[in-house]
Amino acid sequence: MEMKQISETTLKITISMDDLEERGMELKDFLIPQEKTEEFFYTVMDELDLPDNFKDSGMLSFRVTPRKDRLDVFVTKSDLNKEINFDDLADLGDVSQMTPEDFFKTIEKSMIEKGDVNAHEKLEKIEEMMEEAVDAVMTQNAEEQKEEESPFEPLDYVHYVLDFMTIQDAITFSKTVTFPIEASELYKSSDRYHMTILLDIQNQPSYYANVMYARLIEHALPGSKTRAYLQEHAHQLLEDHAVTELQKVELV
């Protein structure tokens, strides 16, 4: 793994495929955020020698960019939550209709009314941190633009959920699949079966995803639940290679 500080508030961590494999992770684990992914990020952070200003950060956000031979993780820190009680924002009215200037004036007035004698200094610091956050985003975008100009393009995946009324329907569907599938899972809910399908559409024409979806629903129903819902509320029957496993089943 390699770490590079690209601004005062942003780190770039490059993780090789070997690093992922050693930690029991795959690229598909990062397509849908889950607890396993978050734990992996913080484990990596613990292993690296972080700059001092990141070790006691109020908040950390992670942005993942898959590459052909690695994973780029941009880590952005913010101490904003240490400077202001966000519960107080409920008293400010509809902040979505305020200009930035009106927003800061309203916060300042609220803080002064509550006896905060250091309101001016705190607001100046908040504004400074917000400017740093904007700068970090611009720096990150510039960094990604450079990456896009490199010969390695990001992997591109499409994810589907399909429904089946019976397990026999799911088996029949699996036997019609003659194209590569990156991953597939089988779930059981109270009234039907559900299958998740992950396709790699890298280097495919723009219409490829739509064509593949049309092929999938020739022998399946459009999904009625999301994968996140199934992970939380349904029972997982097969993991990762559901289609391959069901293809082995002989229907009588």
From Swiss-Prot:
GO molecular function: protein-macromolecule adaptor activity
Gene3D superfamilies noted in UniProt: 3.30.70.1950
Pfam families recorded: MecA (PF05389)
Domain of life (superkingdom): Bacteria
HAMAP family: MecA (MF_01124)
Family: Belongs to the MecA family.
Assembly mode: Homodimer.
Domain remarks: The N-terminal domain probably binds unfolded/aggregated proteins; the C-terminal domain interacts with ClpC.
Protein purpose: Enables the recognition and targeting of unfolded and aggregated proteins to the ClpC protease or to other proteins involved in proteolysis.
Protein name: Adapter protein MecA
